[in-house]
Amino acid sequence: MAGVLKKTTGLVGLAVCNTPHERLRILYTKILDVLEEIPKNAAYRKYTEQITNEKLAMVKAEPDVKKLEDQLQGGQLEEVILQAEHELNLARKMREWKLWEPLVEEPPADQWKWPI
């Protein structure tokens, strides 16, 4: 793994991460662990799992920070870490909300009809 290449991200409030590969591996693994608790047929799990596995494979395969940033196409690795933290929070909320379950009550017949 390449050492720290910069002293600042140039983004207010976003500090440089000294171990971005390790941090991303941990976050992506946690996301996948949470997704395991969501049914396999849930769209959120299916697509998020696919994207997260792809990103995790890139992190494991590319030791160079700059090349990894280019592959992930999410900005600086610190920004990618922030995105992964947000995805982990969302995955936990999706697990809690159980959006794959049927609605408690039927929606109104013309709920999505427009114009009224």
UniProtKB/Swiss-Prot annotation:
Location in the cell: Mitochondrion inner membrane
Tissue occurrence: Expressed in all tissues examined with highest levels in heart, skeletal muscle and brain.
GO molecular function: NADH dehydrogenase (ubiquinone) activity
InterPro entries xref list: NDUFA5 (IPR006806)
Bilayer-crossing regions: none
GO process annotations (BP): aerobic respiration; mitochondrial electron transport, NADH to ubiquinone; proton motive force-driven mitochondrial ATP synthesis; respiratory electron transport chain
Name by which UniProt lists this protein: NADH dehydrogenase [ubiquinone] 1 alpha subcomplex subunit 5
Keywords: Acetylation, Electron transport, Membrane, Mitochondrion, Mitochondrion inner membrane, Respiratory chain, Transport
UniProt subunit comment: Complex I is composed of 45 different subunits.
Leader peptide range in chain numbering: none
GO cellular component, one term: mitochondrion
Modified residues (N6-succinyllysine): K98
Major site of localization recorded for this protein: mitochondrion
Superkingdom to which the source organism belongs: Eukaryota
Pfam families tied to this protein: ETC_C1_NDUFA5
Residue positions where N6-acetyllysine is found in the record: K30, K46, K60, K98
Membrane topology, from the record: Peripheral membrane protein
Ranges in a coiled coil: none
